[in-house]
Each structure stands twice: as structure tokens, then as C-alpha cells.
């Protein structure tokens, strides 16, 4: 699960603060709308396994990019 908060969209980028389950540190994310890719990000030490969580956020921004984005979104999978 990943919670995206404070989602903001400009012509070039979508930014947000991500809260990954079991991780106490928020992560700043920036999605490049032209490249349709997440810009480089920094995960806290020992949280390399969270890369897949960021990938889910990236896929969400790719699909929701043309519609109006909410200020907050929770993404869950199994």
C-alpha cells in the first residue's frame, strides 16, 4: 500500500508526498508528464523493497494523468 498526499499537477509535473506502508519517513515524488516517468527519488536506508510501491504510484499517474487528480489517493494491491 502507498498513500499519496498533497498531489499537485502543473503542465510539466505531478508532485506529491508518498507514505509507504511500514515506512515512517515520507518520500517526495515527482512524475514527469512528458516522459511519463517518475523522476529519481531517494528511499530511506533498508527500504529498497519499496521500489515496487513507487512503481505503482508511477502507473497510477500514467493512467490518471489526463483526468482531474484528487489531493490524496491510497493505492492498494495484492
Residue spans for each PLM region:
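N-terminal acidic leader/helix
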Residues: 2-34
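Acidic, low-complexity intrinsically disordered segments
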Residues: 25-78
Amino acid at each position: 500500500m502507498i498513500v499519496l498526499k498533497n498531489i499537485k499537477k502543473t503542465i510539466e509535473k505531478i508532485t506529491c508526498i508518498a507514505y509507504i506502508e511500514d515506512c515512517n519517513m515520507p518520500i517526495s515524488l515527482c512524475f514527469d508528464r512528458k516522459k511519463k516517468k517518475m523522476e529519481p527519488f531517494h528511499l530511506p536506508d533498508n527500504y529498497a523493497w519499496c521500489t515496487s510501491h513507487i512503481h505503482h504510484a508511477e502507473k497510477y499517474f500514467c493512467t490518471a494523468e489526463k483526468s482531474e487528480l484528487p489531493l490524496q489517493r491510497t493505492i492498494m494491491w495484492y
